[in-house]
């Protein structure tokens, strides 16, 4: 049992509630619940197993479910009851939402903003949780680097962009490198190079997009956050989306779009903005789908823009009255990309639109 788990467990046994303990220790209520639960599981473990685990530095019962304990005269096999993985994951996500406090943002920085302008901050293919070895790929990458990169890149974009009244942050799919603890792509089952545990990477992704949203809120009057599905995080993206929606549930300046489906579409004056990860359809079909599904917006606009990611390199084309732009990824190359001679560079952008004139400004931050 870790000292943190023992501390939370002892306070709980003395009659303190989990929320009270969380306030006292300065932690989320979900963190305290998890520590108490792990402590209880440890105390229910056979003492011999506790001792064996302690000897090899595995005090956290959540790490080890079974194994062999070798003694002088025999080898003993033990097996701990294993939680249902699906139920345990859902419980953890639910607890995280419950313990996540709503945020009181500091006041927006003083200064006028232009109601005729809107700025888009796309975050394509960040692959938080990916691990790259610099000697193999040319550049190191892990969870901490990914979060720092998003904070730095978006921060520079916000600082250099016009003071538009509105802003949209679009996590354009593959925000997370892995969808779960299997460390494989959901559809193709390709084995992934993953840094740390999925639980930690999920928390890091929530933190990174929250940091981006709150930096943008210091400049813009209204910030919309969009978290889209990717082929790497087919369902994990929803945990990020719902966590952020809960975080800003009482905030009037940050709105997290919570809609089912894979497409984001927004009208701003004569501008039509759309995005999708880009793994399921080519540009021509995306444009036809846009016109067919949102004919009112199509007919009411003159400047139309479609963002995709997925392939990690830059490509822009005009298709049937729409500027379709495939964006460079935020992530570094992994071993697969390096071995296949992919050489695209990482990049952040901030694109500003005038409600009547279309795109009027673009900031690029190369990594």
Predicted regions and their residues:
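Acidic, histidine-bearing metal-coordination/catalytic regions of metal-dependent phosphoesterases
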Residues: 2-144, 148-151, 162-163
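N-terminal short leaders/motifs
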Residues: 58-69, 210-227, 274, 304-309
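Peripheral, non-catalytic segments of secretory and membrane proteins
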Residues: 16, 188, 365-366
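Core catalytic region of metal-dependent phosphoesterases/phosphodiesterases
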Residues: 107-108, 113-126, 134, 139-254
């Amino acid at each position: 049992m870790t000292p943190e788990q023992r501390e939370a467990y002892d306070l709980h046994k003395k009659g303190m509630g989990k929320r009270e303990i969380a306030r006292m220790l300065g932690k989320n209520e979900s963190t305290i619940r998890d520590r108490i639960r792990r402590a209880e599981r440890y105390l229910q473990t056979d003492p011999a197993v506790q001792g064996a685990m302690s000897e090899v530095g595995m005090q956290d019962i959540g790490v080890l479910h079974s194994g062999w304990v070798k003694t002088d005269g025999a080898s003993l096999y033990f097996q701990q009851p294993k939680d249902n993985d699906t139920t345990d994951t859902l419980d953890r996500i639910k607890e995280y939402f419950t313990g996540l406090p709503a945020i009181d943002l500091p006041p927006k920085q003083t200064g006028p903003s232009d109601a005729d302008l809107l700025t888009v901050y796309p975050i394509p293919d960040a692959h938080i949780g990916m691990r790259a070895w610099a000697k193999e790929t040319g550049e190191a990458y892990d969870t901490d680097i990914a979060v720092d990169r998003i904070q730095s890149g978006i921060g520079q974009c916000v600082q250099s962009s016009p003071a538009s009244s509105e802003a949209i942050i679009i996590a354009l799919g593959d925000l997370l490198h892995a969808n779960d603890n299997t460390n494989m792509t959901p559809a193709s089952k390709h084995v992934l190079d993953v840094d740390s545990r999925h639980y930690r990477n999920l928390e890091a992704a929530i933190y990174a997009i929250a940091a981006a949203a709150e930096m943008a809120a210091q400049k813009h009057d209204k910030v919309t956050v969009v978290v889209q599905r990717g082929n790497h995080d087919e369902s994990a993206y929803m945990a990020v989306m719902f966590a952020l929606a809960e975080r800003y549930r009482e905030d009037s300046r940050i709105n997290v779009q919570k809609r089912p489906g894979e497409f984001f579409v927004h009208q701003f004056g004569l501008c039509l903005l759309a995005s999708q990860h880009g793994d399921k359809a080519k540009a021509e079909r995306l444009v036809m789908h846009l016109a067919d599904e949102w004919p009112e917006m199509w007919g009411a606009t003159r400047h139309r823009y479609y963002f995709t990611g997925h392939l990690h390199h830059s490509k822009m084309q005009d298709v049937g009255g729409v500027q379709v732009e495939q964006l460079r990824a935020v992530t570094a190359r992994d071993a697969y990309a390096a071995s296949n001679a992919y050489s695209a560079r990482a990049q952040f952008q901030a694109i500003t639109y005038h409600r009547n004139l279309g795109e009027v400004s673009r900031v690029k931050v190369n990594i």
